[in-house]
Structure formats: C-alpha cells, structure tokens
Amino acid sequence: MYKPKNQKRSVLKFKRFSNHGYSLFAVLGKEVLIGVLSVATLQNATAKGISVKTEKAETDSTFANRGVLMQEVNVTGTRAPLTVSQQARMVTVLSREDIQAAPVQSVNDLLKYAVGVDVRQKGPIGALTDVSIRGGNSEQITILLNGINICDAQTGHNSFDFPVDISEIERIEVLEGPAARVYGTSSLLGAINIVTRTPQKTSLSAHVEGGSYGYLSAGVRGNIASKDHWNNQLSASYTRSDGYLRNKAGSLNADYHTAKAFYQGNYTDENMAVRWHAGMSLKDFGSNTFYSAKYDDQFEHTFKTFTAIQAENLRGRFHIRPSIYWNRNMDRFELFRGAANKYPFNYHRTDIYGVNLNAYFDWNLGRTAFAAELRNEDLVSGNLGEPLSRPKHIHGTDRDYTVGLNRTNIQFVLEHNIILDRFTLSAGLTAVKNSQADMPMHVYPGVDASYRIGDAWKLYASYNSSLRMPSFTELFYSVGGHKADKHLRPEELSAFEAGVKYDNKGVTAKASLYWNNHKNLIDWISDGTLDTNGAVLWKSVNFGKIKHFGTEASLDFDLYQLLPSQKFFKKFGVAYSYIHQKKVDNQGYVSKYALEYLKNKFVSNLQLNLWRNLDLGFYYRFQHRMGNYIDTNNQLQRYKSYGVVDSRMSWKASTWTAYIEANNLFGAHYVDYGNVPQPGAWVVAGVSLNL
C-alpha cells in the first residue's frame, strides 16, 4: 500500500542513462509514462512540467557522440515524484536536444513529427497554424506556457502566439486524450505544455539564420543566476519572411513579421519556490485566403501579453501550489489589406484572468489531491458578442468596441491515488460550471490504471471525460461568408484507451488503442450555399455525435546502445497512426474540421554522425487526410495524400553551432488546408552562440 512520505526535496537515481542529444518524440520524441497524470502532479502544472525534470550532466561533444552510458543521473523534484515503474498515462516529451536536432524553425513545424498530432499550416514559419490531437481541431486542446493556460478564448487559430522563440524552449510535453481533471475546459483531446529554459549559471546566447523567401530570424538571451537563490532571464527575437505566395494583383499576401520578448525569474530556498514571467508577442502576417477563398488579400495583426506568478512550499506534509495569471490578446483582421474603406477592420480584445489552487497530502491509504480554479474570459469587439452598455474606445483609431461577452468558469477537482508494487490506480472527479452555459454544474469522472510486468513491459488502460465551451468566434463570427450561432452548446467527450509499452536495452516500442465518443461536437459546415457577396457560406453548428476509433504504434532504436562498436548510426525510428471515424450522414455538407481528419499518418527519422561533430538527420512524414474542400471556383475537391522529406546537417562545437536545414527537400505539392498551397523546397542556414 502507498505509504506517507516525508515532503523533503527528494532525489531519485536512475541507474542507467544514455547521454544522447535526442529522444523518442513519437518518432522524433521520447515517450514517457507520467505517474497517472494525477492532480497532485499535474493540476496547475509548473515550469517543471508534466514530466520529471532531468538534471543533465555536463559533457563535451566527443562523449555525446560516442553515446557514453552514464551510470547514475539524479532526477530531482520539489515533491516525492512517482518513479518510472509506477507511471500510467502516456505523455510525449521532446527535450531541448531533440529540438536542436530537428530541421524546424517553429514549434508548429516540430509538432508535425508527433504521430498523434495534426498540424494544418496556413502560412510560413507558423504564421497561422491549427494544431490538433487525435482527429480533433485547434479549439479542442489546451496550450500551456510553463504550466499556465494561454489559450485564446476568441479563437484557437491564435493559440500558438506565445512570447518565446523556439531556441528558448527547454522541452515540449504532449498529453493525448481528455484531461478535464488535469487542465479543465478546452482540454477536450489533450494538452501541449511549453517549458522555457532556466539555466543555473549566468550565461549569454544568440542566434541568427536566414534562407528562402526572404526569411530572417535573430534572437538573444541573457541569464543572471546569483548564489543567493535568485535567477533572472531576459530574451528577445525577431523573425520575418516575404512569404511564398502572391495575390491576383501580384502583391505579397503570405508575408510575416513577428517580434517576441520574454522575462522570467525565480526564487528558491529550502522552504519554498516562487516563479514569475512576463512576455509579449507582436505579429503581422498576410492571411492570403485563410478565412475565405473568395478574398486573396486578407491581413491580420495580433499583439499578446502574458503575466503569471506561481509558488509552492517544499516542506511539510501538506503540499500547496497556487498561481495567478493574466493574458491579454488583441487582434485586428483586415478582409481587404489596408483598405478599411472596402470593408471595416475587425477589432477584438480578450482579457483572461485566472487563479488556481492545487493541494495534496499523503496518508495510509495513498495520496489524495484536490484543486480549484477560477478563470474569467472578457471579450470586447467590433463584431463578436452582445451589445455593450458602455462602448470602449479602440486605441489608435476613431472607433469603439461596441459588443462583447464576459464569462466565468469554475472548476473543482478531487482525486485519489493508490500505488502498489506492480499496480497503480488513479481515480477522480471534476466538477465544472460556466456562467455562459445554460446548464447546472456537470461532473466528469476519470480513472487511469497500469500494471507492470517485469522491468521492461507495462500494460495500461484509462477512461476519461471532458468538455469544451465554444470559442467567441464560433458563437458570434458572421463576416466574410460565415454565420455563427450564439446558442451553441458545450461539446463533450468520453474516451477509453488501452496500450502496452516495452522499453529495454536501446529498444522502445509502444502500441495503443483508443475510442473517442463526441457529443454536441462544434464545427463549421457548408452545403455550398453562397452569401450575398458570392462567397461560400459557412455556419457554426453542434454537429451531433461522432465516434473515433484509433490506434498508434511506434518503434525506436538507440543504435549506440544496440551497436556500441560503431559511431555512424545514432538513431532510427518509425511511428504510425490510424483513425477511423464512424460514418456520419452529412447530408451533402462539407465540414471545415470534424470530417477533415488524418486517417493515416506515418513518420520516421534516421540520425547519423558523419564525422566527429558533424551530424546529419533525415525526417519523413506521410499524411492521408479525409474530407473535402470547396475551391476558388466553388467546386468540391478531395484532399490528396502526400509525403515530405526534411533534413538537417550541423556541426557543434563547445560554444557555437552551425547548421543548414532543408524542408520539403523534393518540392512536394500539397495543402494542409483547402486553397492554401504549402511552399516547395525551403532552405535555411544559421549559427548559434552560447557563452
């Protein structure tokens, strides 16, 4: 039976650890079974993240390339963490080394290699990207920055506008499946947590890179770590591109400019830890035909700010972790770029305030956890919402915000964990009430279990449920060929999952099955009807009930461990996912999201060490998407399957790294989203410095 443990800072020692700069992220990442993803370890996840933090030993590049097997590595936590052998639900973790090895310029590009993630890109370098999990859409997942929810209640399209450059990310964690008792509303199909770097020594780093289509990116980061428990870090970056498309008039309509700045600090002593951050993201980009195929000169400007503070006690039997945050999102959409006289610009401002309190304690029957969260979402807009009693001025214009909406979400969680020698069980309930929803407080249960067979095999199974409130866009957007329904009901999901994992001596294999049952699923649909301006009319609706059956499998080889006598082959991996959607009588409707899912996805990668510190990696992905889209001639088109090859070559020295990357190496023609063709071959070269 689970026994109470002293709440001192504890250290777990893994006896065997391969010091490689890459791990299993589906094919690119590392599959980590995280201790039943309990409230005690996950609710209001901190910058330590979903996974157990690994303190990486310092090694030079020679040792790294030889794949030295270190005999003991400390894994330190601020609570008594569950060991690897006790863990149950799957979380995919991409480390900093994995990020550096991949041929990508944005987090969105990186997630394309996660087999369970669907990345539908509408522009270069993540200008506008919809990221979803297991056949869902961008509205159905929660995005977190250092454990703080940064989802945009206006629309999921802008959820990846966070204030840190990809070079400043320590790791990315992907949780697949409903997570109501972990992250609350919006985590209908999972969550993605982005954890930033916190170097323990004073340091300075910078990078610059350039490439195809006028691409340029540069950034700098400075960190001051004092000996009296304080750590402060400041970073900034700028990225631009001319884009790869032109409108009918020959002007740029996929260009991109973004600036980011981020400050984070922390204080830690023997009794407590406090962390805080503040950041901003400014982005201007040509929106091409992103929102309507009829108009090819759309433009969007977004400005976001993020502030948060978190704390936790490090001693005592009763463990408490509170946090408070405020995110502001400002958005200006131009149906005709720079021509407000043709159609007035759409202005929106969303302020999101949140307070979380998570607590747990250990006793003779296990670990009991409870949590509470209050989240307020306030929108003022020019065209989204109900009429305001007192209009608010739009800064820098002669117009006012005349409509808006305010809603509050309250969540309570109760959970208990039982840990035996080979068996782990976690069960809990989440109670949710939203001021906008015309329904009483709803309760969503969840249970996770795992059974360990020896040291290498593990069986696991889970049942979880969750819900999602409609976004403000789904409720009120009626512009440019769209007609929203303000009476949309929340969508709900219940899901079963079962799987097996094998991990031993350089070989990792995983297979899983899942069943997702959607109720009142929200989507935009069209029957081909045109609006008064001749654009295809899309309506937001509760689509009804849809069932998904899916399977995922991956096989990864650490070739340094399997073939220690050679140095050329570093790693090889393959992964595959399959989704079957129960046939729905769509009565001739075309769906924007619900029926446009990835039925088949295959990813693989091979990493080589050519000579000394010269590495070369190849990455391949194949995607087969279901569904149709209406082209610019109002004709119905089916999505075509495609395969893309990417590559990266790098030379890593002690204080600098030089690299060249090629995306879509063979120039495949494809679309992730109807009427928005993706770029052909894209080449980037750069250098980074670390002092």
PLM segments and residue spans:
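N-terminal periplasmic "start-of-domain" segments of outer-membrane beta-barrel proteins
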Residues: 69-100, 130
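A beta-strand signature from Gram-negative outer-membrane beta-barrel systems
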Residues: 166-203, 557-558, 563
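Short strand-turn segments of transmembrane beta-barrel domains in outer membranes
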Residues: 191, 196-225, 236, 251-255
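Outer-membrane beta-barrel signature, preferentially recognizing the C-terminal barrel domain
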Residues: 292-314, 348-350, 405, 438, ...
